[in-house]
Amino acid sequence: MKHEIIHTIFERGGENTAFAQYFVGQSYLNMLSTEQVPVGCVTFAPGCRNNWHIHHASKGGGQILLCTGGRGWYQEEGQPARALRAGDVVHIPAGVKHWHGAEADSWFIHLAVEVPGEGTRNEWCEPVSDEEYSKLNLLEAL
């Protein structure tokens, strides 16, 4: 199956090798800002998703996703997954276990904004299982 590559105003960036161990599939990262507030443009190849993870902070913190292209998923632990499209915004409070990534047959691009806080750190957890992930993509196809 041929997958259309989505183009946005930001460059795709290089292969996300620094975080590859926390992703299933291929992702790309273009750090747009490392000053004041870190902002990265993350591109997920079809079927790519990151592991469950938590953005910890003793005060403030969390993450904001600004979806810019393609089709993706966001899910918080214990909640149903949410389909994401260009223009969607996701506010992720500190301490919430979650994952995000592309649909099986679409590229997905978002800006990841790290919300400033005190005592911030990321905890990477288990991968989203293929079984869990494939159920979402079957629902989307219906």
Per-segment meaning from a language model:
Residues 35-37, 45-50, 69-73, 118:
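Short, charged/polar surface micro-motifs in flexible loops or helix N-caps
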Residues 42, 90:
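Conserved GNAT-family N-acetyltransferase fold
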Residues 49-52, 59-86, 96:
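A short beta-strand-loop-beta hairpin characteristic of the jelly-roll/cupin
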Residues 1-38, 51, 121-142:
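A short, N-terminal "cap"/entry segment at the start of jelly-roll beta-barrel domains
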Residues 36, 59-61, 106-107:
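Short acidic/glycine-enriched loop/turn segments that link adjacent beta-strands
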Residues 41, 54, 68, 76-78, ...:
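Residue-level recognition of conserved beta-strand positions in structured domain cores
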Residues 73, 80-81, 85-86, 94-123:
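Ligand-binding loop in jelly-roll beta-barrel domains
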